[in-house]
Every structure is written in structure tokens, then in C-alpha cells.
């Protein structure tokens, strides 16, 4: 019988990968970490049974998470990444002319596994762990606690697990208020928000909470390899930024595989019933 890794979503929906072998498994202080060699998508990183990425396709997540916000902001110089222990989000941020990017990851084991076995970070994680990267800094700790006590960010990116379970606090009004205070004016906050079809209630709830806090709130989706796509993202704006418009000249300098200015125009095409529900909030 062929071996497979299956992630089960609500209502009995599953995403499966045929696997060659399990490479790694560990129960860290926070979660179960697994790495598999898949048949057609490279290595798969899973946390508590949920797919975080497959190495042949991870850019379909990291690019739409990072670049729309970075290109919509007029001058993003200081960036905070909450989560993102695999290094992919920081890697994409550093394609831009930033002065500093700080990554706050609660689970150091995720960083070590990603550095040694996933290797999508172009050596960033090693440099960050040793404090030797000129622009990218690392803090091992709770992103919620960090953001309570730190200010002055142009862009804040939440690269967290799905909006259920332990990460649910990162989709609360309380957290969003700390984020708003931590942003410069103008500033942009972006977070992944789960499967459009399977986490619809969580998406609507998070959108409603963000509307209480931010000056403008946007939603968009993107087809992500390895996830129950389309995958939702939420954006909160502090100040006067039109997230639907990006700097196309800056975009030309980026090395991109999935997201680009042409794709940006399609980001906001949510299914009709979800679009109408969010517009009523």
C-alpha cells in the first residue's frame, strides 16, 4: 500500500501527498514537528499534522503573503515577521530595500529543523541564529508578548499557523490593537487567514475584529500549493494606503515565480457569497 501524508480539514476534506519516507519527527515544547520526503513536491514540513509548506511550491504562499503589502506601502523600511520559522517570509522581505526585519518565532526547534532539513532560507536562518545578518534579526519568543512592547514598524506580517487552536489569539481584537499601536503611520498588517471555503467562519470572524481596529481592511486570496486553496489573507491598514494599488516599478526588481502586478489585480476576486458577507460587516 502506498504511503501518504494526509492533512484533514473540516467537513472531512483532506489534502494528501504520496511520501517516500519520513525524515524527521520530534515533539518540541510547543508542537509535533515532522518532515517528509514527498514523491513530487520535495520536502514537506508539518506542525501538529498541518502542512506548513512543501519545498517545491512554497513560494506560492510566501510571495503573496509578503509582496502585496511591501509594494503597497510607499516606503517599507522596518518590518516585523511574527512566526515564519522556516525563513521563507524573511527571505522574501529582504528582496526589498529595508533597513531591518525582525522575526519573532516561539519555537526554536522549527528554526533548527528548517535550517537543516528544509533549506528554503538561502542561509538566512544560520546567520540570524548567530546574529551575523546585517538586516535580519531573530527573537525567540511569543509574538503576542513581543508586539505589546515594541513599536515603529512599517509592515507587520503574521506568518502563523491556521486561525484555529493555539494561533486563534493572533486573530483577536486585543492582538489587532497591539498591532495597530506597533505600526507607523502609514503602516500595513497582513496575515494568512486559512482556507477560503473551509475556514469561512474564522475568516469572517477575523475580518469583523479587524474592522473594529484598522482604518481600512482588505481581503484577498491566492492558490497555494499544498493547502486547501484558495487561501485567504487579511490586511489591516493604519493611515492612508490604498492596498489595491502597488508600486509596479519596484515590483520589476523582484525575483518572482507566482505573484506579480498582473496577479495583484486578481487577488480580490473572492467567491460571491463570501464577498457579499464581508461587505455587509
Curated annotation (Swiss-Prot):
**Pfam families annotated for this entry?**
Spermine_synt_N (PF17284), Spermine_synth (PF01564)
- The record places the active site at 159 (proton acceptor)
**Which residues does the annotation say bind S-methyl-5'-thioadenosine?**
31, 105, 142-143, 166
**Transferase: present as a keyword of the record?**
yes
Predominant place of localization: cytoplasm
Highest taxon in the source lineage: Archaea
Q: In which pathway does it act?
A: Amine and polyamine biosynthesis; spermidine biosynthesis; spermidine from putrescine: step 1/1
GO biological processes: polyamine biosynthetic process; spermidine biosynthetic process
Q: What is its EC number?
A: 2.5.1.23, 2.5.1.-, 2.5.1.104, 2.5.1.16
Q: How does it assemble?
A: Homodimer.
**The protein's name:** Polyamine aminopropyltransferase
Q: Which organism is it from?
A: Pyrococcus furiosus (strain ATCC 43587 / DSM 3638 / JCM 8422 / Vc1)
Q: Which gene encodes it?
A: speE
Amino acid at each position: 500500500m502506498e504511503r501518504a501524508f494526509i492533512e484533514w480539514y473540516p467537513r472531512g476534506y483532506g489534502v494528501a501527498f504520496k511520501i517516500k519516507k519520513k525524515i524527521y519527527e520530534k515533539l518540541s515544547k510547543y508542537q509535533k514537528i515532522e518532515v517528509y520526503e514527498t514523491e513530487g513536491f520535495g520536502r514537506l514540513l508539518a506542525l501538529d499534522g498541518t502542512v506548513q509548506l512543501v519545498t517545491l511550491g512554497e513560494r506560492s504562499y510566501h510571495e503573496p503573503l509578503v509582496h502585496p503589502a511591501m509594494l503597497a506601502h510607499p516606503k517599507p523600511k522596518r518590518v516585523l515577521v511574527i512566526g515564519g520559522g522556516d525563513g521563507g517570509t524573511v527571505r522574501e522581505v529582504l528582496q526589498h530595500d529595508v533597513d531591518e526585519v525582525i522575526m519573532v518565532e516561539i519555537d526554536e526547534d522549527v528554526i533548527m529543523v528548517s535550517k537543516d532539513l528544509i533549506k528554503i532560507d538561502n542561509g538566512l536562518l544560520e546567520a540570524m541564529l548567530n546574529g551575523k545578518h546585517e538586516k535580519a534579526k531573530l527573537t525567540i519568543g511569543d509574538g503576542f508578548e513581543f508586539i505589546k512592547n515594541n513599536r515603529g514598524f512599517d509592515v507587520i506580517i503574521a506568518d502563523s499557523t491556521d486561525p484555529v487552536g493555539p494561533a486563534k489569539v493572533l486573530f483577536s481584537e486585543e492582538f489587532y490593537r497591539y498591532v495597530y499601536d506597533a505600526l507607523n503611520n502609514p503602516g500595513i498588517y497582513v496575515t494568512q487567514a486559512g482556507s477560503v471555503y473551509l475556514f469561512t467562519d474564522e475568516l469572517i470572524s477575523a475580518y469583523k475584529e479587524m474592522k473594529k481596529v484598522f482604518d481600512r481592511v482588505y481581503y484577498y486570496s491566492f492558490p497555494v500549493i499544498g493547502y486547501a486553496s484558495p487561501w485567504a489573507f487579511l490586511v489591516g491598514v493604519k493611515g492612508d494606503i490604498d492596498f489595491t494599488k502597488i508600486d509596479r516599478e519596484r515590483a520589476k526588481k523582484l525575483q518572482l515565480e507566482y505573484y506579480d502586478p498582473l496577479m495583484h489585480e486578481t487577488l480580490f476576486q473572492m467567491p460571491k457569497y463570501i464577498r457579499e458577507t464581508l461587505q455587509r460587516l
